[in-house]
Amino acid sequence: MKVEVCSFSGSKVYPGAGRLFVRGDNKVFRFVNKKSESLFLQRKNPRRLSWTVLYRRMHKKGISEEHAKKRTRRTVKHQRGIVGANLDVIKEKRNQRPEVRAAARAAALKQRKDKRAASESEKKAIKAKSAASSARGQAIKNAKVAARR
């Protein structure tokens, strides 16, 4: 047994009861009685009529039991190790004194600067060497051109 719902009042429409209204755009409306159909055709708002299900739902009528508020899950911070660092190592670093940490940072910076300076000086040496060889090659070319003339 298929029980329909009234398009206006929201009440149940049992088989063999109620009225069916088909609009020009083929939208079907089911009404429990002539009263609902008439009010629908008058374009009355069912939320403003106190006997409709929509009104009762909107104004929280007939809800007998007060159900408890839904509890939201709280996020809990949890520490765990990451790739390349164990949890013990992380805790140890966190518990270090600021002076020790600053000294370690300064040492790491100095090491990085020294490494960069070394690589730059190496690049300069290679560049100077290639420039000298290209200058020598250019001088030989110039000498050959001068010899032809």
Curated annotation (Swiss-Prot):
Region ranges (Disordered): 96-149
GO cellular component: cytosol; cytosolic large ribosomal subunit
Family annotation (Pfam families): Ribosomal_L24e (PF01246)
Gene3D superfamilies: 6.10.250.1270, Ribosomal protein L24e
Keyword terms: Cytoplasm, Phosphoprotein, Ribonucleoprotein, Ribosomal protein
Gene Ontology molecular function: mRNA binding; structural constituent of ribosome
BP-aspect Gene Ontology terms: cytoplasmic translation
Keyword Cytoplasm: yes
Residue(s) carrying Phosphoserine: 50
Assembly notes: Component of the large ribosomal subunit (LSU). Mature yeast ribosomes consist of a small (40S) and a large (60S) subunit. The 40S small subunit contains 1 molecule of ribosomal RNA (18S rRNA) and at least 33 different proteins. The large 60S subunit contains 3 rRNA molecules (25S, 5.8S and 5S rRNA) and at least 46 different proteins.
Described function: Component of the ribosome, a large ribonucleoprotein complex responsible for the synthesis of proteins in the cell. The small ribosomal subunit (SSU) binds messenger RNAs (mRNAs) and translates the encoded message by selecting cognate aminoacyl-transfer RNA (tRNA) molecules. The large subunit (LSU) contains the ribosomal catalytic site termed the peptidyl transferase center (PTC), which catalyzes the formation of peptide bonds, thereby polymerizing the amino acids delivered by tRNAs into a polypeptide chain.
Additional information: There are 2 genes for eL24 in S.pombe.
Similarity section: Belongs to the eukaryotic ribosomal protein eL24 family.
Protein name: Large ribosomal subunit protein eL24B
Protein source organism: Schizosaccharomyces pombe (strain 972 / ATCC 24843)
Gene expressing this chain: rpl2402
